[in-house]
């Protein structure tokens, strides 16, 4: 931190002559004469020696100087002049290699101010909102460096977003609240936040920040953005994260269903750390080794996850699970009125998971006999046929629908494709007559 940080702006003014570089920068600024005069007086008071010493803490000191020493009511033009001088200095430095290294936007133990970003074209996008709190990022707070890296990585991703300015501002505010929450609650890693901590964050927003549900949801989006950004930008896949993003798992196309809306695998709902760790190990094996279709793996995991959540609520380690506990769980899911086929899917999922636990040495044997609990499935036929009269009526009014809906209906009616398959068709899959 520069020497001026230890000085107080009310100290007795010393006889100090500003360097020519600083005087020229102030004189070249397009502002009122009295504004330039106040800047020179303040810089002389703090003994500014180089424009590189201009940063956000000094800007705040200048704000206090204007407010409490000069008793000015409208300080906006004066702060704008300060910012313009700093921004002009950054633009000049970015023309040289040494200057780019000096002004590079990087994570340091200091306060970062977005209008002083090394990419001044990007910084000027926030020029009209530079007075807002979400422009200031204090990385001097007592928090683990790893957490600061995650916040800084997400901050850069949000700054590069191409969305509307209002939405980007909401993301910045949400990320700032998340950073503050993590510091206050000693959270060292965004990727290990579980469901309980997520609820605590919602309560934090409810009690201190956001007054309505929609505001909470908008600010909560920052947590998902941070999780996704960090997970995708990690040099290697972080298998210890509580939320995995499918696009980072590098799965071949033949294992993915293009029509599936599944984008994440979540472990945060499993409250017991040991059970959560076993679930991650199981899914890492399924995704990385088995070669099965991802949809099959994810569906099975949903059944296993439900069981592990129930066990964790009982504060029971899955390795010490007994047959009586499994029977209690099966009785519980039967109360939901599930079909015999779905019940057998639960049995098959538990069997698959316990075989994995035995094969990897976490258990000596499977704690129940799956075949004993399986039910007889009676196939059912669902008549989904459409009468010819209805088909003719739809075809007669088809011209009233938009082109994409007409194409979808004709595919379903003529070709027999599934709805999910039709939804995956793209524009370049069609041949247009005479084109």
Predicted feature residues:
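Short, flexible/disordered secondary-structure transition segments
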Residues: 340, 361-365, 405
């Amino acid at each position: 931190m520069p020497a001026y940080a230890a000085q107080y702006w009310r100290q007795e003014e010393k006889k100090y002559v500003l360097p020519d570089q600083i005087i020229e920068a102030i004189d070249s600024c397009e502002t009122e004469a009295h504004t330039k005069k106040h800047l020179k007086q303040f810089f002389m008071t703090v003994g500014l020696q180089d424009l590189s010493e201009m940063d956000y803490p000094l800007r705040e000191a200048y704000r206090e100087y204007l407010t409490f020493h000069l008793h000015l009511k409208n300080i906006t033009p004066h702060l704008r002049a300060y910012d313009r001088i700093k921004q002009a200095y950054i633009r000049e430095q970015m023309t040289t290699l040494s200057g780019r290294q000096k002004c590079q936007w990087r994570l340091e133990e200091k306060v970062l101010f977005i209008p002083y970003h090394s990419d001044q074209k990007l910084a000027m996008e926030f020029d009209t909102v530079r007075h807002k709190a979400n422009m200031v990022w204090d990385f001097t707070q007592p928090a683990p460096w790893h957490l600061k890296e995650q916040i800084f990585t997400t901050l850069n991703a949000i700054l590069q977003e191409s969305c509307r300015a209002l939405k980007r501002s909401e993301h910045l505010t949400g990320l700032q609240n998340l950073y503050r929450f993590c510091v206050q609650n000693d959270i060292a890693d965004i990727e290990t936040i579980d469901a309980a901590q997520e609820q605590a964050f919602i309560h934090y927003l409810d009690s201190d920040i956001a007054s309505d549900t929609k505001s909470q949801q908008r600010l909560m989006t920052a947590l998902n953005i941070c999780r996704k950004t960090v997970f995708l930008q990690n040099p290697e896949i972080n298998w210890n994260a509580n939320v995995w993003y499918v696009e980072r798992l590098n799965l071949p196309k033949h294992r993915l269903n293009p029509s599936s809306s599944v984008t994440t695998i979540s472990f945060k709902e499993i409250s017991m750390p040991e059970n959560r760790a076993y679930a991650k190990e199981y899914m890492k094996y399924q995704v990385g080794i088995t070669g099965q279709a991802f949809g099959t793996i994810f569906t099975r995991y949903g059944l296993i996850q439900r069981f592990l959540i129930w066990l964790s609520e009982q504060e029971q380690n899955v390795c010490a699970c007994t047959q009586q506990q499994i029977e209690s769980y099966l009785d519980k899911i039967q109360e939901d009125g599930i079909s015999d086929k779905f019940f057998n899917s639960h049995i098959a999922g538990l069997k698959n998971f316990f075989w994995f636990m035995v094969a990897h040495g976490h258990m000596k044997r499977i704690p129940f006999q799956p075949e004993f609990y399986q039910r007889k499935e009676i196939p059912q036929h669902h008549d989904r046929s459409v009468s010819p009269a209805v088909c003719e009526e739809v075809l007669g009014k088809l011209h009233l629908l938009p082109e994409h809906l007409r194409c979808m209906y004709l595919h379903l009616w003529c070709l027999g494709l599934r709805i999910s398959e039709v939804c995956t068709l793209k524009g370049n899959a069609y041949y247009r007559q005479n084109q």
